[in-house]
Curated annotation (Swiss-Prot):
Gene3D superfamilies: 3.30.300.10. It comes from Synechococcus sp. (strain JA-3-3Ab) (Cyanobacteria bacterium Yellowstone A-Prime). Its cofactor is Mg(2+); K(+). InterPro entries: ADOMET_SYNTHASE_CS, S-AdoMet_synt_C, S-AdoMet_synt_central, S-AdoMet_synt_N, S-AdoMet_synthetase, S-AdoMet_synthetase_sfam. This is S-adenosylmethionine synthase.
Length: 414
């Protein structure tokens, strides 16, 4: 069995991620060359913005915060956190010139530049992972895919009034049963959702929880699984608000920080993680852009039918354009050797930061999408949301990889 969790947009850490990425969107929309490292802290009645920004853009950060908090659903001060009454403290510095010089002019541009993609160095050292598998149509692990579906539906029934007693904070967790490496059933579903103390005339705590449990099954679980081949059954354990109630939530219940939900943001623990968060960072930061590129590589390999599972690791040195290492691992599911896949990747994917920026248009996307792009992926996962038309989710190289792998496997092996 394997478990993964997701959270709704009203979770304190996710509030921070969305504000951080709304800042990235606003700055890149006005100045695509902005350098951003925006960190956010939320607590009862307070939002703190800090980090480093170098940009020609002028942004009203206080208004941006209030608009995003209201959009998420915190509009009532009685809940301990409200868009219009919370304090907003802003404390940004500029990016360190020592870091900037390595990003602006990579080591290669000062020693052995071959083309324009050697100009930009990695914004930091680090290692990033990308992953894909064939458990779902979007080529994501099934546990995290289901957890995100439940969280998204939980937020939807709150916002559309189906369950008006719900409040913005919520979490989901799904445990999937596997046999011989393939998902075969749903072992446990867990939904914790913030709610009002009473529901209409229902005031007794146990009765409130009974109503919530029944409503969540009908309005959240059943719609999510309606058209899926694997469904909960009589053996599935269904848990809702196991503490007995969840009235106090959001920033009033827990402080939130940017970058504390990196497993929710990626593969639900199914794949390894390099440790770097995504939100609040402009795409010169390889924590973000290289993780997107690694997902793109892995997804195209699986989409090509060259493996059932694929994990890609890439690492960088600060101020250096070319990756330090590249690793392809298919866990015994590859149709050609991993060494052959590595050679294919080296031939067809350019993982220098400037090349990633150019291919995915990561600096231009906020402006192209009307001022909001990164904030949309700051909740419900940076991977697998195919409805958002994310460039790293495309499988436009799958046919090429398939053709070359099977036509020239011997040549690739050398």
């Amino acid at each position: 069995m394997f478990s993964s969790e997701s959270v709704t947009e009203g979770h304190p850490d996710k509030i921070c991620d969305q504000i951080s990425d709304a800042i990235v969107d606003a700055l890149l929309t006005a100045d695509p060359l902005s350098r951003v490292a925006a960190e956010v802290v939320v607590n009862t009645g307070m939002v703190i913005l800090t980090g480093e920004i170098t940009s020609q853009a002028h942004v009203n950060f206080t208004r941006l915060v209030r608009d995003k908090v209201a959009e998420i659903g915190y509009t009532d001060a009685k809940n301990g956190f409200s868009a219009e009454s919370c304090a907003v403290l802003v404390a940004f510095d500029e990016q360190s010139p020592d870091i900037a010089q390595g990003v602006n002019l990579a080591l290669e541009s000062r020693t052995s530049q071959e083309d324009e993609f050697d100009l930009i160095g990695a914004g930091d050292q680090g290692l990033m992972f990308g992953f894909a598998c064939d458990e779902t149509p979007e080529l994501m692990p099934l546990p995290i895919s289901l957890a995100h579906r439940l969280s998204r539906q939980l937020a939807a029934v709150r916002k559309n009034g189906t369950l008006p007693y719900l409040r913005p904070d919520g979490k989901t967790q799904v445990t999937v049963a596997y046999e011989e490496g393939r998902p075969v059933g749903i072992h446990t579903l867990l939904i914790s959702t913030q709610h009002t103390p009473t529901i209409g005339a229902i005031t007794e705590e146990a009765a409130v929880q009974e109503r919530i449990r029944a409503d969540l099954w009908e309005a959240v679980v059943q719609p999510v699984f309606a058209e899926l081949p694997i469904k909960p059954d009589g053996n599935t354990r269904f848990l809702t608000n196991p503490t007995g109630k969840f009235v106090i939530g959001g920033p009033q219940g827990d402080a939130g920080l940017t970058g504390r939900k990196i497993i929710v943001d990626t593969y639900g623990g199914y794949s390894r993680h390099g440790g770097g968060a995504f939100s609040g960072k402009d795409p010169t930061k390889v924590d973000r852009s290289a993780a997107y590129a690694a997902r793109y590589v892995a997804k195209n390999i699986v989409a090509a039918g060259l493996a059932q599972k694929c994990e890609v690791q890439v690492s960088y040195a600060i101020g250096v354009a070319r990756p330090i290492n590249l690793l392809v691992e298919t866990f015994g599911t590859g149709r050609i050797p991993d060494e052959a896949l590595l050679r294919l990747v080296q031939r067809h994917f350019d993982l220098r930061p400037a090349a990633i920026l150019a291919q995915f248009q990561l600096r231009e996307l906020p402006r192209q999408r009307g001022g909001r792009f990164y904030q949309n992926v700051a909740v419900y996962g940076h991977f697998g949301q195919t409805h958002l038309d994310l460039p790293w989710e495309r499988t436009d190289k799958a046919a090429l990889l398939r053709e070359e792998a099977f036509a020239g496997a011997t040549a690739i092996l050398g």
